[in-house]
Design a protein with these regions (language model features):
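Ligand-binding pockets and gating/stacking loops
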Residues: 1-448
Length: 448
């Protein structure tokens, strides 16, 4: 198979709302901070609260655009042809569980997966769907394109970054790009993701701020100096209440140490993997992102978000799934789960496969399916999750929930709970307003 770096650079052009990368990256005035600044801010301001955090990391694979549940996870062979589509159910490794024949690879690892077929919410546009599924909370009334500000809820990765224990690597990393609604909101940019901004499937893949630069641009150097001046001002003010804040110079040294650290450099250096292992994942963007994510959690990253795009199949749904989307997805997911298991990491690594909504039961005149948040499917594995089960059910037309509705809040509460973070604890905005991590959801008890 061929390298697919071009896929990620144009990942939004196929979405019906036409979001652009600049809009997504505008998550705060300090959104351009580099690794040293992130390390400084995370260590200076991290205040873990609640019950002790478990040693469980999370790989959060988000299928941007909206996966068609009835063509993948929740096949309806007895529905009319205009609903059931062109795919058929196949038996899987888990007794009694069937999925689509477009996912033969995933059918071999369903014993590790818990498939939730009754996820539901009410937001049918991409921006609002991104937000509710990434944060567990609706963004409020009005149009929303996925570009968070301090009035919105922080995403799961930022919650984990804020409440987890800092390690040698940034606690929240996004690959290959920034995920819609994947920002920290009122928690502040120190808890935002370290974004790779490069496709690990590319032959020349490398990660910024990990390799020592030969030169630093004038603008970037000026920005760092401005941050340092602001830190010095803050240090002087902080002396009246304590000496918990240290010089940013220390964190530049730490970042430089990370650049020269064998462990850190190896974690980001996907080229150290054998050709056989890379081929097992597939030399595609999603395949190599999954492999890189395994390397990152193995090295101590708490939360890795994977952007997997182009699922907005308004046209040619069957062709898009069969020839473009599912082959790479269906290769990457079982490779990741099997690799984690073989390395003894699956019990300590929660893998979440999510999306912003499902697709309409009725196939449209363009042979595609449109947005449908009424019911859809997500899946989880590892991290204490009992595999080989289906939770909830859609109706016979895959149009609504028939049993056990699951909300985005439930999903968010579940991930936090599995990672040992109390989902109902209270955080405060910079103005002192109390905000619960999850105010409308509870952990999905059937998973454990």
């Amino acid at each position: 198979m061929t390298h697919s770096s071009a896929r990620t650079t144009s990942r939004l052009s196929s979405y019906c709302d036409g979001l652009n990368r600049r809009e997504m990256l505008s998550v705060g005035s300090l959104g351009g901070l580099g690794l040293a600044e992130l390390l400084w801010m995370q260590e200076s301001f991290a205040k873990a609260k609640g019950k002790p955090v478990r040693d469980i990391n999370c790989i959060f694979l988000f299928a941007l655009g909206g996966q068609p549940h009835q063509d993948m996870w929740d096949v309806k062979p007895d529905a009319p042809s205009e609903i059931r589509g062109d795919f058929n159910p196949i038996s899987t490794k888990a007794s009694g569980i069937q999925i689509s024949d477009v996912l033969p690879g995933i059918s071999t690892v369903t014993d590790k997966l818990a498939i939730m077929r009754s996820v539901t919410h009410v937001d049918s546009d991409h921006g609002r769907g991104y937000h509710v599924m990434m944060t567990g909370k609706r963004p409020g009334a009005g149009d929303f394109n996925g570009n968070q500000n301090n009035n919105h809820h922080p995403c799961l990765g930022s919650m984990v970054s804020r409440l987890g224990t800092p390690g040698e690597l940034p606690p929240y990393i996004s690959v290959p790009n920034f995920l819609n609604s994947g920002g920290p909101s009122f928690l502040g940019p120190s808890y935002g993701p370290f974004v790779i901004e490069a496709d690990p499937a590319a032959p020349d893949f490398s990660v910024r701020d990990i390799t020592l630069p030969t030169a630093i641009s004038t603008n970037r150097n000026a920005r760092r100096q401005a941050v340092l001046r602001e830190i010095n001002r803050f240090e002087r003010q902080a002396e009246t209440v304590g000496r918990s804040v240290r010089s940013l110079d220390t964190f530049y040294q730490k970042a430089a140490g990370l650049m020269t650290s064998k462990k850190a450099k190896e974690a980001f250096d996907i080229h150290r993997e054998s050709d056989k292992t890379r081929a097992e994942y597939g030399m595609t963007s999603v395949g190599q992102c999954c492999l890189l994510s395994r390397r990152l959690v193995e090295a101590g990253c708490r939360f890795v978000a994977i952007e997997n795009g182009h699922w907005d199949t308004h046209r040619k749904n069957t062709y898009s799934l069969k020839d473009l989307l599912c082959p790479s997805f269906d290769r990457a997911v079982p490779a990741l789960l099997n690799d984690l298991e073989q390395r003894g990491m699956l019990d300590d690594t929660l893998v979440v496969i999510s999306t912003e909504f499902g697709r309409t039961p009725q196939i449209n005149q363009l042979a595609g399916r449109d947005h449908w948040p009424n019911v859809f499917s997500i899946a989880m594995a590892g991290g204490g999750v009992k595999g080989g089960q289906v939770i909830g059910a859609s109706d016979r037309r895959a149009a609504g929930v028939a049993d056990r509705p699951i909300t985005p809040g439930d999903m968010t509460a579940t991930v936090l709970d599995l990672m040992g973070i109390d989902p109902h604890q209270i955080l405060h905005t910079p103005l002192g307003r109390p905000i619960p991590l999850v105010d409308d959801g509870r952990p999905i008890t059937e998973l454990t």
